[in-house]
Amino acid sequence: MSRQSKMPFPSPQPETEPTLGFTIWISLRRGISPQAEQVFERSLADYMDSRDLQWWGTHLCAAVSGDDRDLTETDQVDLLLWLVEGVTPTTVEIGPLGPGTGLPARRDSVPVVRAQSSDLMLIPMIWLYRAARVDARQVLQMLGGFSTISTVH
């Protein structure tokens, strides 16, 4: 099993108000083998461990929080971009935790930011973010902000 090594993401500007955590939903590529899904799950666990992030749920829907800290927009964007750069996920959505629960929110009940690996605009966005030309908040805004309520089919 190979581990993806990525350059650390810069944090060019002061962070905005931290949050306790967020919910993440991941849609995998169709026809993925069980072995490839296990490799993805392990890679995700390694990513979370390397950044002192805790997650409750599955590798497809989880609540993410900091080990001993609140999370910021940079934490959200770093994870989102790491996921869409991979081969396995096709769509990644990030939203708030369930109101008052600290658990993953229902996908159709909260506003989300959505990124799809097939979106060619992500490539320059990732480059600009890594070059510290845009910050995490700007990336979230370019992706549409937390304005869309996901429709589950």
Task: Locate each region found by the language model.
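Long, contiguous binding/interaction regions
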Residues: 1-153
